[in-house]
Amino acid sequence: MTPLVGNKAIEGAAIAWVMELERAAGRDPRDTRHKGAPADIESPPRVIEVKAFGTTTRGYDLPLEVRQMDEAKRNPNFYLYVVEHVKQGDPDEFTLRVLGGERLQRLLERAKEYRGYYVPWPVADYDAGALGLDQ
């Protein structure tokens, strides 16, 4: 299997895999990533935010956007699906950890707010830049 490169590829593979799992569980998942929804997938009755990681998340914090945190606190059907070991590219090797209900609520009580920025870096600009210290 070819390893996946980049966050978008890892996230896309994880979301596709979760949607397959949801269908196998008899639910009807819909990808809501580009629809302004607070989570990646609506799979009634569940609202699912997929957190995709190239390797394990053991010992790491899970980032949530403010709107995801608000939805998680408000909606008892909000779930975090943590998909690990995605980078290697073989769905048979992916692992899933599901956080929902009281367990998720207990974790949310300990959440720490952070503030940060993501700076868009278009491919054209990336490709046009010099390598190394010769900037």
Language-model segment annotations:
Residues 1-30:
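Acidic-basic catalytic patches of nuclease active cores, encompassing PD-(D/E)XK
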Residues 6, 12, 26, 36, ...:
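Residue-identity detector for glycine
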Residues 22, 41-54:
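Conserved catalytic cores of phosphodiester-cleaving nucleases, focusing on short active-site segments
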Residues 25, 50-104:
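Catalytic cores of nucleic-acid endonucleases
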Residues 28, 62, 119-121:
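Intrinsic-disorder/low-complexity coil detector
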Residues 29-42:
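Active-site metal-binding core of divalent-cation-utilizing nuclease and nuclease-like domains
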Residues 83-135:
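Domain-level recognition of nuclease-like catalytic cores that cleave nucleotide substrates
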